[in-house]
Design a protein with these regions (language model features):
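Short, surface-exposed recognition loops or helix-turn segments adjacent to catalytic cores
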Residues: 64, 149-150
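Short His-Asn-centered micro-motif
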Residues: 57, 150-151
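Active-site entrance/lid segments in N-terminal catalytic domains of soluble metabolic enzymes
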Residues: 1-142
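Conserved active-site-proximal phosphate/metal-binding subdomains
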Residues: 110-148, 154-296
């Protein structure tokens, strides 16, 4: 059956219930984009559903604590790409008497939307290893907020490097697509298994930021004006302006990401970090964690 891209509190609750069955009493996090419409409602719904942590990127969440005041034990973790952004967040959060539980610093090799201009994604000064230290120094000014590195981290060597810089941990996403447990359609995984390094590119997005993904048939159909028609149903992200930006770039991001998740190779948008082409076989999360911790 066709599923429209509306937000559903019941669906969110079901996702949390399923995740809770797997993780038990361990901390459970929700990643909620600041750019979505009804951001505050979704944050509150996630807290009600049992989130222990809320992670937010796609904007600078200066009022994030406003929506969790009834849930004081929920840790709030913003995603930033500069020390300046962290300083602004911490200053704004003073009125809520709150500081971030941690901060994620995402460099320009990550999959999906970037916190940089297109040309800056290629400049040395904006690479993760060069933006991480100023954020760590800024974090010390607010009580040693734990700093988590993200974007292009692939193996134990990368993990060890950023831990040595003073990071408390790392965030990884793309490599976990190549696991049996990842719930994306097998055809999504095949796209990465078959991708070459040059296939993973930066592209335009209705959100107004460069986004990294695998160049597939969707990009060719956009160029040839044969991509699926843009019909804004849910008004999901504010920068898209009810589908106006989607029509300019040639695709609806919610529809195309949904198509990729369901394995539609013809019309799907397959986000991936810059190292996605390195996935060469599907393994278990257990095996992957052993590789990441033992360096195999």
């Amino acid at each position: 059956k066709e599923v429209l891209n509306f937000y559903s509190k019941d669906a969110l609750k079901e996702i949390f219930d399923n995740a809770r069955k797997i993780c038990g009493n361990l901390p459970l996090a929700a990643n909620i984009l600041y750019a979505i419409n009804d951001y505050g409602r979704v944050v509150r719904d996630a807290c009600e559903a049992g989130a222990n942590i809320i992670i937010t990127g796609a904007g600078i969440p200066t009022n994030m604590p406003e929506f969790t005041k009834d849930f004081p034990d929920v840790a709030l973790i913003p995603i930033v790409s500069s020390a300046r952004a962290l300083k602004l967040i911490c200053k704004k959060w003073q009125r809520y008497n709150k500081i971030p539980g941690a901060v994620i610093v995402e460099g320009p090799l990550s999959g999906g939307h970037q916190g940089f201009k297109y040309e800056d994604c290629y400049k040395e000064e904006f690479q993760l290893e060069n933006i991480i230290t100023p954020v760590i120094e800024e974090a010390k000014n607010w009580g040693n907020i734990p700093v988590i590195a993200a974007g292009g981290i692939w193996d134990k060597k990368d993990i060890d490097k950023f831990i040595s810089f003073g990071c408390a941990g790392v965030q990884m996403a793309t490599r976990f697509i190549g696991t049996f447990e990842c719930d994306a359609d097998p055809k999504f995984k095949d796209v990465l298994l078959n991708a070459k390094e040059e296939d993973i590119v930066l592209m335009s997005s209705p959100v107004g930021l460069p986004a990294r993904g695998v160049k597939t048939n969707l990009q060719f159909s956009i160029e040839n004006h044969t991509a699926p028609k843009v019909q804004c149903i849910s008004n999901c992200v504010a920068p898209c302006n009810r589908g106006h930006e989607a029509k300019l770039v040639g695709y609806c991001i919610a529809d195309r990401l949904g198509a990729a998740y369901k394995g539609d190779v013809e019309t799907g948008l397959f986000f991936s970090g810059s190292n996605g082409y390195k996935i060469d076989k599907i393994i278990s999360v257990k095996e992957l964690m052993e590789k990441l911790t033992k360096g195999e």
